Swiss-Prot record:
Organism: Praedatophasma maraisi
Positions carrying Leucine amide: L9
GO biological process, one term: neuropeptide signaling pathway
Name of the featured protein: Extended FMRFamide-3
Compartments it resides in: Secreted
CC terms in the record's Gene Ontology section: extracellular region
Keyword Nucleotide-binding: no
Keywords associated with the record: Amidation, Neuropeptide, Secreted
Entry annotated with the keyword Secreted: yes
Stated family: Belongs to the FARP (FMRF amide related peptide) family.
Organism superkingdom: Eukaryota
Function: FMRFamides and FMRFamide-like peptides are neuropeptides.
Taxon lineage: Eukaryota, Metazoa, Ecdysozoa, Arthropoda, Hexapoda
Amino acid sequence: GPETAFLRL
């Protein structure tokens, strides 16, 4: 979910 995009920082 959206949390994955955050982890890709």
